[in-house]
Amino acid sequence: MENKFAFAKEIVKEAASYIRKHMKDDLHVERKTSPTDLVTRLDKEVQDFLVDKILSRYPHDQFCAEEGNLRASINQDSVWVIDPIDGTNNFVAQGEDFAIMVAYFENGIGQFGIIYDVMKDACYHGGGAFRAYLNDQPLPDFKNKPLCDFLIAGNAGMLESNTWGVADLSKASLGVRVYGSAAISFSRILSGQLLAYITYLQPWDYAAASILGEGLGYQIVTLSGEPVDFESRQPIMMAPREKLAEIQSYIYERKLS
């Protein structure tokens, strides 16, 4: 597994270099399911690059990835979950605050995750049997303190409408941040800068963080308190295990019928 982990980090860094080299080119921006659901030429090229690299080394591995129709279940033998550019709107509009995310599973068990903040050259990597790091520095275990001393991150629409009581939770916290990228939000949690992140996500949006956070004391669950299914878009949150009950006291009582 160490060789596979090292290989994954290597190809993710190569993909990041490719993005930085070509991000000023014509991106051929398209809209998928809505006016704000953007995809670029580089989303597709980076995913193809990663898949091709992996298959050249591990020809029997399978994939669940954002672009196209790669939808293998993580419960199969060897499955990579890939989001080639998370935060595509940030990528297009700002040229920063976007990331590559890769997770690797064997028979449903997360082996390692990688979140690579492309413009900051910040690689969050580890999980499973590996200690979680930011580049070469160990990531901190969760340190508890009162809810009112923590920032949280969330979905702007959920906050505005108080869906699931997210606005109520934000009022009990130190404040709320909206980053426009699951990867960037998760990286802030892993660094100890945020308590929790609440939004709607697809499996490729949270797979890497679910593996990275486990050993640091964090968990990803649905807003109805169940394990995520790694198959569909769901309302989810990442939060410290020891804070889940307190957060649930704001969230779950107000869930939509």
Where are these regions (language model features)?
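N-terminal subdomain of lithium-sensitive/metallo-dependent phosphomonoesterases centered on the IMPase/IPPase/PAP
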Residues: 1-85
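Residue-level signal for inorganic ion chemistry
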Residues: 19, 43, 54, 88, ...
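A short, compositionally biased
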Residues: 25, 98, 126-130, 214, ...
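Solvent-exposed alpha-helices and their adjacent loops that cap or buttress functional pockets
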Residues: 31, 72-74, 107, 125, ...
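Generic detector of well-ordered alpha-helical packing
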Residues: 44, 67, 84-87, 118, ...
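DPxDG-like acidic metal-binding loop motif
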Residues: 74-133
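A structural micro-motif at secondary-structure boundaries
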Residues: 134-138
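An extended, acidic
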Residues: 142-257
